[in-house]
Amino acid sequence: MSFVVIIPARFASTRLPGKPLLDINGKPMIVHVLERARESGAERIIVATDHEDVARAVEAAGGEVCMTRADHQSGTERLAEVVEKCGFSDDTVIVNVQGDEPMIPAVIIRQVAENLAQRQVGMATLAAPVHSAEEAFNPNVVKVVLDSEGYALYFSRATIPWDRDRFAKGLETVGDNFLRHLGIYGYRAGFIRRYVNWQPSPLEHIEMLEQLRVLWYGEKIHVAVAEQVPGTGVDTAEDLERVRAEMR
């Protein structure tokens, strides 16, 4: 099947300035992400950035760049600019791979594209089982609950679903009822065009989760369990050191 990968790579980062260019074992982080995307079999891979230094690093590695505005409020807005500049047809399958995921398995990039292509829905994503209480109660780990057909009912930083009987006995263990959301998305290009014209939703602002806008407006998001759980993403200096060690 045919799909396009777009990798948003914003240069400014509060915790890690210049994050896309941080060195991981001799290569800029963004180049590692580009290489994972190439392994997925995508027809076309585009790095969307607002910074010339990132563009030069990607082009030096043989990658394609689309320069975007610096004032986007979200990664999806940056994707929308690329979709318009490239003139993708509404039915083009687009996979959004985060620029700070140098250890993302190529197999799940393709998985989310295939899941979307097989369904009459505008958006798809992935999740992974939660096995520890630490994850279940961590607000930085986004949980998702699904309906009987694998469509998202809700995403939350809260512990959902709340296991009333188990948690009444203590919060040390969790059962098999929890899924954590993975930050990889597949979209049809036409859906991206519609999405950016919707006003942000109240729930989106409360949880600070952009995908809640989709549910607020009555659209469906298909969620599959990832065939392979991705490694550490890079949000902090500690994450960076961990990734460097794991990728040696």
Swiss-Prot record:
<keyword id="KW-0963">Cytoplasm</keyword>
<comment type="pathway">
    <text>Nucleotide-sugar biosynthesis; CMP-3-deoxy-D-manno-octulosonate biosynthesis; CMP-3-deoxy-D-manno-octulosonate from 3-deoxy-D-manno-octulosonate and CTP: step 1/1.</text>
</comment>
<keyword id="KW-0448">Lipopolysaccharide biosynthesis</keyword>
<comment type="function">
    <text>Activates KDO (a required 8-carbon sugar) for incorporation into bacterial lipopolysaccharide in Gram-negative bacteria.</text>
</comment>
<keyword id="KW-0548">Nucleotidyltransferase</keyword>
<comment type="pathway">
    <text>Bacterial outer membrane biogenesis; lipopolysaccharide biosynthesis.</text>
</comment>
<dbReference type="GO" id="GO:0008690">
    <property type="term" value="F:3-deoxy-manno-octulosonate cytidylyltransferase activity"/>
</dbReference>
<protein>
    <recommendedName>
        <fullName>3-deoxy-manno-octulosonate cytidylyltransferase</fullName>
        <ecNumber>2.7.7.38</ecNumber>
    </recommendedName>
</protein>
<comment type="similarity">
    <text>Belongs to the KdsB family.</text>
</comment>
<dbReference type="InterPro" id="IPR004528">
    <property type="entry name" value="KdsB"/>
</dbReference>
<keyword id="KW-0808">Transferase</keyword>
<dbReference type="GO" id="GO:0009103">
    <property type="term" value="P:lipopolysaccharide biosynthetic process"/>
</dbReference>
<dbReference type="InterPro" id="IPR029044">
    <property type="entry name" value="Nucleotide-diphossugar_trans"/>
</dbReference>
<dbReference type="Pfam" id="PF02348">
    <property type="entry name" value="CTP_transf_3"/>
</dbReference>
<dbReference type="InterPro" id="IPR003329">
    <property type="entry name" value="Cytidylyl_trans"/>
</dbReference>
<dbReference type="GO" id="GO:0033468">
    <property type="term" value="P:CMP-keto-3-deoxy-D-manno-octulosonic acid biosynthetic process"/>
</dbReference>
<dbReference type="GO" id="GO:0005829">
    <property type="term" value="C:cytosol"/>
</dbReference>
